[in-house]
Amino acid sequence: MHGENEVVVLRLGHRPGRDNRMTTHVGLTARALGADRVSIAGAASDSKATIEDITDRFGGPFEVELTTEPRALVRDWAGTVVHLTMYGQRIQDVEADIREAHASGPVLIVVGAEKVPFDVYEQADYNVGVTNQPHSEVAGLAVFLDRLFEGRQLDREWENADRRVVPKETGKRVEPVDEE
């Protein structure tokens, strides 16, 4: 999140045609809930374009990149690596340690699509489970980011937005942002 050590989400194992919507939602969730960047492994140019379009319209900063070497990103990461998996340690048991690690350096969050190679489990500093039950990787990422930032990301100011959502009790309203 802007003003803190970098948080990057790595979408590992994107399968074209099968994972387009889910990969897009991983990126949009990362953006909305405080990450600085998403790196997508695989041929996901449609997801990249959609996430960039939302960032252009609703603000950032947020970066999207495609990578052909995701395992090198994990291996060479100069910070804490967190792998979200239902088999990991309970989030409530490790979240304070991860927040402490984030206070002193960047965090890479690995979110798998297909079966994650075992070396990712071994290279991760933390394998973290959100409920240790099968569910959506998007839900796991959202809960993890909220726990990492302790809700601070919900009050974030969006830079360079063309439009903004106006909160309403009922109905919906999106309005242009006036540059002053």
UniProtKB/Swiss-Prot annotation:
Domain of life per record = Archaea
Q: What is this protein called?
A: tRNA (cytidine(56)-2'-O)-methyltransferase
Record's keyword annotation contains Cell membrane:
no
- GO cellular component terms, semicolon-separated: cytoplasm
Binding of S-adenosyl-L-methionine, residues: 84, 112-116
UniProt entry keywords in alphabetical sequence: Cytoplasm, Methyltransferase, S-adenosyl-L-methionine, Transferase, tRNA processing
Q: Which family does the similarity line name?
A: Belongs to the aTrm56 family.
Q: Provide any one GO MF term from the record.
A: tRNA (cytidine(56)-2'-O)-methyltransferase activity
Q: Name one GO biological process term.
A: tRNA nucleoside ribose methylation
Summary of the function given for this chain in its UniProt record? Specifically catalyzes the AdoMet-dependent 2'-O-ribose methylation of cytidine at position 56 in tRNAs.
Tell me its EC number(s), please. Answer: 2.1.1.206
Subcellular localization: Cytoplasm
Oligomeric state and interaction partners are given as: Homodimer.
A Pfam family (short name) is Trm56
**PANTHER family listed in its UniProt record:** TRNA (CYTIDINE(56)-2'-O)-METHYLTRANSFERASE
Q: Which InterPro entries match?
A: Alpha/beta_knot_MTases, tRNA_m1G_MTases_N, tRNA_mtfrase_aTrm56
Please write the reaction equations for the catalytic activity of this protein: cytidine(56) in tRNA + S-adenosyl-L-methionine = 2'-O-methylcytidine(56) in tRNA + S-adenosyl-L-homocysteine + H(+)
Q: Which cysteines are joined by disulfide bonds?
A: none
Chief location bin: cytoplasm
